[in-house]
Amino acid sequence: MNNKTNWVIIGRFGRPHGIKGFVTVHSFTDPADNILRYNDWHVFLNKQWQPLKLLTIEVRSKAIIAQIEGYPKRELVSALTNLDIGVQESQLAALAPGEYYWYQLIGMSVINSKGDLFGKVVEIMPTGSNDVLVVEGEKRHLIPYLPGQFVINVDESQQVITVDWDMNF
C-alpha cells in the first residue's frame, strides 16, 4: 500500500469543524454524498497510503463532516486538512462499456480527426447540462464531453481522446 497506483482520490479533507475532532470532507464524487458508499478511506501520508477508521460521518445541509479515530480534538484533526482521501480502484462500481470515471480521462491526450493535438485533459468541469474537458496545450481548450457528438472515441490503451472540434475554438 505504499505507492499511488491503483488508488482513486474520492475527496479531500477540509478544515476542522467544531472542537470535538470533526473535519469537513470535500467530496469529489457525483453526487457528493456518494462518498458515503466507501468506508475504507486512506490518506497519502509519509509517502504511503494509510488507512483511516471513520467513527462518524454526517451529511449536513451544506457540508459533509467526519470524525476519524485517533483525531479526537480540533488541534489533532487539523493535520488532515488538505489531505486527499483515496480508495482502492477495485472498490469502484463497474461501468458500462463507453463510460469512464473522470480520473481515467484526466491526463489523456486530445486530438481531432485531422490529427491536430490539443494537449492533455487536466480537469473536467461539471456544468449542469454536461461535463466539459479542460485541455491544456499551446492554448487552453474547453470541449464539451458529449460522446457521439463532440467526443468521437476514447482509446484507453493509447490514452487518446479523439474529438470533433476545431483547433480555433
From Swiss-Prot:
Q: Does the keyword rRNA processing apply?
A: yes
- Domain called PRC barrel: residue spans: 97-169
Q: Name one GO biological process term.
A: rRNA processing
Where the protein is mainly located, per its record? cytoplasm
Q: Where in the cell is it found?
A: Cytoplasm
Q: Give the matching Pfam families.
A: PRC_RimM, RimM
Q: Which domain of life is it from?
A: Bacteria
Q: Where does the record place a coiled coil?
A: none
Q: What is known of its domains?
A: The PRC barrel domain binds ribosomal protein uS19.
Subunit info here reads: Binds ribosomal protein uS19.
Q: Which PANTHER family match?
A: RIBOSOME MATURATION FACTOR RIMM
NCBIfam families, sorted: 16S_RimM
**Protein name, entry field:** Ribosome maturation factor RimM
Source organism: Legionella pneumophila subsp. pneumophila (strain Philadelphia 1 / ATCC 33152 / DSM 7513)
Upper taxonomic classification of the species? Bacteria, Pseudomonadati, Pseudomonadota, Gammaproteobacteria, Legionellales
Q: Which gene encodes it?
A: rimM
